[in-house]
């Protein structure tokens, strides 16, 4: 992290407050990861209903991501950060007030606005602030808020749920995100980049289907399906196997692995290219799901968690930096919104689809099916990530530059 010593005081302060806000955001959000499915089951929901409620989170992301990206480009990143953090602070209080499926779906969808706004504005602001030649390194370090939060949050949530019940759990989640709001207030919004008058006016769907965005979005779609099924059902799968493992430890192990990978992959990608690390992350995702599919003891579950953390800790930052490389400053919010649309769709439909599979096939066979998704994602990236198959292979293996990068 020596790169930060070379930055001026105002830039360091901005990055520090942004990092603190991100840490509170992901801790509050992640405190519900291992516990909310159990809460929904506690009030009498079926496996499919659990999947539908959990998947509703991504519906909020899906509906709001395009508008949040555009708002970040037009009005600045800070206002979108505030919108996202406010949604994250309010939603946990809503869970306390309802005990039926439909209202829970509505609140869960509202909760999804938090990531649509905060995550989009966060990565856009970091990209604005990072020096171009150290972009991968700075984005990698600043993205550590995710594994740190996802490591701290489930431990807090699991402890509170087991020792004090659901009310303190939801109140603590709201309190953490309220602290995040206080961290955003002193952040100085950088000047808004203006669009040149002679530039092409691409709409959201034109951006999404363009060569520079389409393949990363498809890879994120398949990864979102995998991650959505895992995060929705891993707690229930562990419980169904009878293995003596706190589900919160699964998420903590994944977070430790994710943290470790982000320490060096960002800086390494500045030297070896983004494509190589995207490929490595998809390989790790495949091995992760295989471990979980075959797990019958704590070691295999934790090994799967370690591989999943390495995969997600590499894939999301690498795609984020890849999209930054391919975007001009005045369109970064929309580019991030479009590329992450695939991830949102995957998360949105994973719960209902794989909840149905879990009802008929059981949790173990359901995870077996998800293995194919990561293999397909890897094949697509290896063959379609650049102009043609040979060029794509070279890019995906770190042998050539990204032809879509903005020079």
Predicted regions and their residues:
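Paired small-residue
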Residues: 102-110, 299-307
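Juxtamembrane intracellular "pre-TM" segments in multi-pass secondary transporters
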Residues: 2-12, 189-216, 398-407
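Residue-level signature of mid-helix packing/kink "hotspots" within the transmembrane helices
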Residues: 58-66, 150-151, 255-259, 263, ...
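Conserved MFS/SLC helix-loop-helix module at the cytosolic interface between two early adjacent transmembrane helices
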Residues: 63-96, 271-272
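C-terminal membrane-cytosol helix-exit motif in multi-pass small-molecule transporters
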Residues: 175-193, 380-385
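Helix-breaking motifs and short loop linkers at transmembrane-helix boundaries and internal kinks
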Residues: 76, 97-102, 273, 294-296
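Cytoplasmic helix-loop-helix junction between adjacent transmembrane helices
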Residues: 109-145, 321
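Structural signature of the two symmetry-related core transmembrane helices
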Residues: 79-93, 174, 276-290
């Amino acid at each position: 992290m020596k790169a930060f010593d070379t930055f001026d005081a105002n830039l360091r302060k901005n990055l520090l407050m942004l990092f603190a806000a991100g840490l509170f955001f992901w801790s509050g959000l992640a405190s519900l990861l291992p516990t909310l499915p159990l809460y929904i089951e506690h009030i009498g929901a079926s496996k499919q209903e659990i999947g539908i409620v959990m998947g509703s989170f991504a519906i909020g992301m899906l509906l709001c991501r395009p508008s949040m990206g555009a708002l970040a480009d037009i009005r600045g990143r800070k206002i979108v950060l505030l919108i996202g953090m406010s949604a994250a602070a309010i939603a946990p209080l809503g869970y306390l007030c309802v005990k039926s499926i439909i209202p829970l779906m509505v609140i869960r969808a509202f909760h999804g606005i938090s990531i649509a706004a905060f995550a989009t504005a966060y990565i856009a602001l970091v990209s604005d602030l990072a020096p171009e030649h150290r972009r991968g390194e700075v984005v990698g370090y600043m993205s550590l808020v995710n594994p740190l939060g996802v490591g701290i949050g489930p431990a807090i949530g699991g402890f509170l749920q087991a020792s004090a019940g659901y009310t303190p759990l939801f109140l603590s989640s709201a309190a953490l995100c309220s602290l995040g709001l206080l961290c955003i207030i002193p952040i100085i919004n950088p000047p808004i980049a203006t669009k040149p008058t002679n530039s092409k006016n691409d709409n959201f769907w034109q951006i999404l289907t363009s060569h520079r965005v389409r393949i990363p979005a498809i890879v994120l779609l398949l990864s979102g399906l995998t991650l959505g099924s895992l995060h929705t059902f891993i707690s229930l799968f562990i419980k169904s196997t009878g293995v003596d493992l706190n589900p919160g430890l699964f998420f903590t192990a994944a977070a430790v692995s994710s943290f470790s990978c982000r320490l060096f992959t960002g800086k390494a990608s500045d030297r070896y290219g983004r494509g190589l690390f995207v490929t490595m992350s998809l390989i790790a995702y495949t091995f992760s799901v295989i471990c979980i599919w075959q797990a019958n003891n704590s070691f295999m579950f934790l090994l799967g968690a370690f591989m999943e953390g390495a995969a997600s800790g590499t894939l999301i930052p690498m795609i984020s930096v890849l999209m930054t490389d391919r975007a001009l400053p005045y369109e970064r919010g929309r580019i991030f919104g479009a590329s992450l649309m695939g991830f949102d769709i995957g998360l949105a439909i994973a719960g209902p689809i794989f909840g149905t599979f879990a009802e008929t096939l059981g949790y173990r066979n359901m995870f077996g099916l998800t293995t194919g998704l990561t293999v397909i994602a890897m094949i697509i990236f290896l063959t379609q990530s650049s102009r043609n198959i040979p060029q794509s292979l070279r890019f995906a293996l770190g042998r050539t530059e990204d032809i879509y990068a903005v020079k």
